[in-house]
UniProtKB/Swiss-Prot annotation:
GO molecular function: rRNA binding; structural constituent of ribosome
Assembly, per entry: Part of the 30S ribosomal subunit. Contacts protein S5. The interaction surface between S4 and S5 is involved in control of translational fidelity.
Keywords in alphabetical order: Ribonucleoprotein, Ribosomal protein, RNA-binding, rRNA-binding
Similarity comment: Belongs to the universal ribosomal protein uS4 family.
Keyword rRNA-binding: yes
Organism: Chlorobium phaeobacteroides (strain DSM 266 / SMG 266 / 2430)
Descriptive protein name: Small ribosomal subunit protein uS4
Signal peptide: none
GO BP, one annotated term: ribosomal small subunit biogenesis
Cellular component GO terms held in the UniProt record: small ribosomal subunit
Function: One of the primary rRNA binding proteins, it binds directly to 16S rRNA where it nucleates assembly of the body of the 30S subunit.
Length: 203
């Protein structure tokens, strides 16, 4: 699947959210949109622009392109419950996201690379599809030849236990994690309003 190849830092500044550790540091120094008039842009933002911005936040945060994001939305609509909540839950179940949440990678982008390069298994079987949706009880583990990679060990050492969510059980020493449950919406702390995305797609 094609991936975004532009500047994540510029996108982060435009959307006002940190999409990577590097972007987070950059935003601390330059917390405004890129470009000559980034600091002085003012004026009322239209409802459509707000909805579009929230969709962009979700897409870039989870590393999902438009066609797949729309597919998640259609699936969320078909499920019982609140569509926006369902959408967030689907994105949180992605393999690359759970790898990131487990502390095995410093960003979702880095987690995606670990997955696509075949470093991880699910229930003992190699899975290299970032969009694979985990179900409760599934075990994520590094393949034997991939254990103790420097980047992974460094990320685990830097990841405080408080950052690892309650719906994932992580064994740092053995570099494995169990996806315990699908998180409730209120357990997912991300800077977006998915209801605006639902309104956008509902038009």
């Amino acid at each position: 699947m094609a991936r975004f190849r532009g500047s994540i830092t510029k996108v982060s500044r435009r959307l006002g959210i940190a999409l990577s550790p590097k972007a987070e540091k950059y935003l601390e120094r330059r917390p405004f949109a890129p470009g000559q008039h980034g600091q002085s842009r003012k004026g009322k933002i239209s409802e459509y622009a707000l909805q579009l911005r929230e969709k962009q936040k979700m897409k870039y945060l989870y590393g999902v392109l438009e066609n797949q994001f729309r597919s998640y939305y259609r699936k969320a609509v078909s499920q019982r419950g609140v569509t926006g909540d369902n959408l967030v839950k689907l994105l949180e179940r992605r393999f690359d996201n759970v790898v990131f949440r487990s502390g095995f990678a410093a960003s979702r982008s880095a987690a995606r690379q670990l997955v696509t390069h075949g470093h991880l298994t699910i229930n003992g079987k190699k899975v290299n599809i970032p969009s694979y949706l985990l179900t409760p009880g599934e075990l994520i583990e590094f393949r034997q030849k991939s254990k103790n990679m420097g980047a992974v060990t460094d990320s685990l050492n830097k990841a405080p236990d408080a950052r690892i969510p309650s719906w994932i059980q992580v064994d740092k020493a053995n570099q494995k994690a169990v996806f315990l449950s699908v998180p409730e919406r209120e357990e997912v702390q991300e800077p977006f309003n998915e209801q605006l995305v639902v309104e956008l797609y509902s038009k």
